[in-house]
Amino acid sequence: MYCLQWLLPVLLIPKPLNPALWFSHSMFMGFYLLNFLLERKPCTICALVFLAALFLICYSCWGNCFLYHCSDSPLPESAHDPGVVGT
């Protein structure tokens, strides 16, 4: 389970508040995960645990999924603040 310590922090990286950056963020995270899986070749158990955690986070639609934004979940309150989005 040593290889899992490099995968689990990826789930904790927050999505940007600016909706214009969501595509760039999801592409970066997808390429990072693909590169990690091809280069480090984690064990099967670690890969399955990570994919199960990623599936549960994205399926529950809590807003932490970096693959897509759920249409029924609202934007964060700070996303409407021009001072935050403009940074």
Curated annotation (Swiss-Prot):
Similarity annotation: Belongs to the BLCAP family.
Entry-linked InterPro entries: BCALP
Name used for this protein in its record: Apoptosis inducing factor BLCAP
A GO cellular-component term linked to this record: membrane
UniProt key word Ribosomal protein: no
Taxonomic source organism: Macaca fascicularis
Subunit structure: Interacts with RB1 (phosphorylated and unphosphorylated). Interacts with STAT3; the interaction is promoted by cell stimulation with IL6 and phosphorylation of STAT3.
Transmembrane segment boundaries: 19-39, 43-63
